[in-house]
Amino acid sequence: MKRLIAAALAAGSLVAGSSAAQVALKPETPNLLFWSAEQQARWYPAMETVYQTRPIAAGDRVHALPLSGRTLDPVFTHAGRTWTVDEYMATYRVSGLLVIRDGRVLLEKYGLGRRPQDRWTSFSVAKSVTAILVGAAIQDGRIKSLQTPVTDILPELRGSAYDGVTLRQLLMMSSGVRWSEDYSDPNSDVAKGPTEGVKLAQGQPGLNPVVAYMRTLPRAHAPGTKFNYNTGETDLVGILLARAVGMGLADYASEKIWKPYGMEMEGAWVTDPGGLERGGCCISMTLRDYGRVGQFVLDEGVIDGHPVLPPGWALEATSKQIENGQAGYGYFWWMQPNGAYQATGIFGQSITTFREDRIIIVVNSAWPKSGGPDLRDGRTALINALRQAAIAPAP
């Protein structure tokens, strides 16, 4: 288990979920972890044609992202060679690259045949959006606080290892409940959980398969003491949130962010076998709408002077709350050694924010594998170069 966690941390994030965690529209759909390059380029922009999804409705207004009047074209070194932005995008299969500073676009580029109106899947970037919505639910009074026991909202978990676990501990990946996220092991929780959950939920109307499986797990550590990346638990937070607000996450995201903040296009959110949006995976949105998510958090969740999030929530969620063997972890947000906070998804999805510089860098990719130091380090070199170019005096 220690080896698994170390490898996953080195990759920057773990796999978003097994193929059985979402419902394919066609039974012959291959495991999304092993799609070919051609399948990635075709299906990442069109997940709603592959899996069951729910729409995130947009409104009439669009949050403006005006051009800054200057462009970025840094040259940087990585892996013993010099790179241009275009060379990086071609080599690392980047479909979208966006740099925003002070709400203005400094760079916007597309690859792999993607167009500005095309969406792209988020993988685990969805976790960070789920955390935003938890904050909105607290602001709305639909969740009392982060100290709310999980079993208060999901009483189906009473008598399980989740007794005494708080919502905050779930958001920190520190419930203490045993979980294995090893995709090479068919007996790991992340591999067998979705299928086993469906079996356990049969004959129990209203019981979500994720809840059915998670409540069978034993406790490994005292709650709040140890970080352990757990995609099943992020889906559990999504179920808890939907229960608290009385609607699906797609509808709540539309109500709290998409419509009032001004996303330019409808989003799509993949659902689990129980028909609920996955708190841990797979929202589809345009490149600029990824940038708007980053800007919304950077602006602390305030829309037209109206706070969508509790005071201080955005800062707290995107600051280190627990040690994780790297720079730290917040509430479904990763801290980075370069001082940024980041929403991260496998196969090269990220929203990186430098708070003090008010810079947001979005990268959407179709990496040939889910992650790894080589891929992560290349992206970090690109991001650092873009940041330096953005803060340099204009010519």
Language-model region placement:
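Bacterial N-terminal signal peptides that target proteins for export
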Residues: 1-8
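N-terminal leader/targeting segments and the immediately adjacent pre-domain N-terminus
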Residues: 5, 17-115, 143, 172, ...
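Active-site SXXK
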Residues: 103, 121-146, 170, 237-241, ...
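A short acidic/small-residue loop/turn micro-motif
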Residues: 111-115, 119, 367-369
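Catalytic-site signature segments of enzymes, centered on catalytic residues
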Residues: 116-117, 182-184, 195-274
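Active-site helix/loop module of the DD-peptidase/beta-lactamase fold
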Residues: 121, 140-182, 216, 243-281, ...
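Active-site Gly/Thr loop motif
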Residues: 208, 264-267, 312-361
